[in-house]
């Protein structure tokens, strides 16, 4: 009995505090800076910006190691498969655009067309740019080489500048002398054929460039796209001149516009790629 009474005396200190309900955290006694993160979860916009920042840092890290982003996207056999496709498209582009360049030069000389001359120069540029892409992907071990990629882009930028100067000078000369283009079936045939073929080549190069994350292939595709636009512009200016001889300046004006577009793209390409060539010059092991 004394033991029971003693246990009763020990268990009488005051009412017991009920435990917190299950599933609920204990209430904080005082609000402070430590409790603010729990009440303010990160916003979706902040999470998206964080992911973008991490992706950019990851790409920069790849470039610092001399690799393109395609090295993490493609398996080795997939990369080699797309490399071979890029080579085939480049060879096909060289053959087609070389034939179109000869035809366009013929039209330019015989029909006094500034747009035809501009297209012929752009076709020669397309041949050279496709040859550079061939060099870019000629080495199977350098399919992901950032240094090789940037060198190809710098060469393309220089070619763009030289070609644009020739196109603009020829177009301005034709405008100043008021040369009137002659219209015939041969001019129509060349313009339609060049417009269709160059547009198809541009789509193929853009697709391969996106998969291989290749700025050189995308630049080559841009050049083919310009060739397609110039081909259709020959058709447009000739058709307009046929119905209204007062609009004789349309042909030369299109030539000037396309020349300036190529010049701007070339300058942008050099500004972007020259520093990157210097940054990756230590990775010539891929050559």
Swiss-Prot record:
It comes from the Eukaryota. Its main location: membrane. It catalyses: Zn(2+)(in) = Zn(2+)(out). GO terms for biological process: myelination; zinc export across plasma membrane. The keyword Isomerase does not apply. The modification Phosphoserine is found at residues 11, 53, 55, 59. One of its GO terms (molecular function) is zinc ion binding. Gene3D superfamilies: Cation efflux protein transmembrane domain (1.20.1510.10). Coiled coil: none annotated. Residues 1-63 are annotated as: Disordered. The keyword Endoplasmic reticulum does not apply. One of its GO terms (cellular component) is late endosome membrane. The chain crosses the membrane at residues 87-107, 115-135, 149-169, 186-206, 216-236, 254-274. Zinc ion transporter that mediates zinc efflux and plays a crucial role in intracellular zinc homeostasis. Binds the divalent cations Zn(2+), Ni(2+), and to a minor extent Cu(2+). Is a functional modulator of P2X purinoceptors, including P2RX1, P2RX3, P2RX4 and P2RX7. Plays a role in central nervous system development and is required for myelination, and survival and proliferation of oligodendrocytes. This is Transmembrane protein 163. It comes from Bos taurus.
């Amino acid at each position: 009995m004394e033991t029971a009474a003693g246990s009763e005396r020990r268990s009488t200190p005051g009412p017991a505090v009920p435990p917190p309900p299950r599933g609920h955290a204990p209430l904080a006694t005082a609000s402070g800076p430590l409790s603010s993160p729990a009440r303010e979860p990160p916003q979706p916009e902040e999470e998206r910006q964080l992911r973008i920042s991490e992706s950019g840092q990851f790409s920069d890290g790849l470039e610092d190691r001399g690799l393109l982003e395609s090295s993490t996207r493609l398996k080795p056999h997939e990369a080699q498969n797309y490399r071979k496709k890029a080579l085939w498209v480049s060879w096909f582009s060289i053959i087609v655009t070389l034939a179109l360049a000869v035809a366009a030069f013929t039209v330019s000389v015989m029909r006094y067309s500034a747009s035809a001359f501009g297209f012929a120069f752009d076709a020669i540029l397309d041949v050279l740019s496709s040859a550079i892409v061939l060099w870019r992907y000629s080495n199977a071990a350098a399919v992901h080489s950032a240094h090789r990629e940037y060198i190809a882009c710098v060469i393309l930028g220089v070619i763009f500048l030289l070609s644009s100067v020739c196109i603009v000078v020829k177009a301005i000369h034709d405008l100043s002398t008021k040369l009137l283009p002659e219209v015939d079936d041969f001019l129509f045939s060349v313009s339609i054929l060049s417009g269709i073929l160059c547009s198809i080549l541009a789509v193929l190069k853009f697709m391969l460039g996106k998969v291989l994350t290749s700025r050189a292939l995308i630049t080559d595709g841009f050049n083919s796209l310009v060739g397609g636009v110039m081909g259709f512009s020959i058709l447009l200016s000739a058709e307009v001149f046929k119905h209204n001889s007062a609009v004789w300046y349309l042909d030369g004006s299109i030539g000037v516009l396309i020349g300036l577009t190529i010049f701007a793209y070339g300058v942008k390409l050099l500004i972007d790629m020259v520093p990157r060539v210097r940054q990756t010059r230590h990775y010539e092991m891929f050559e």
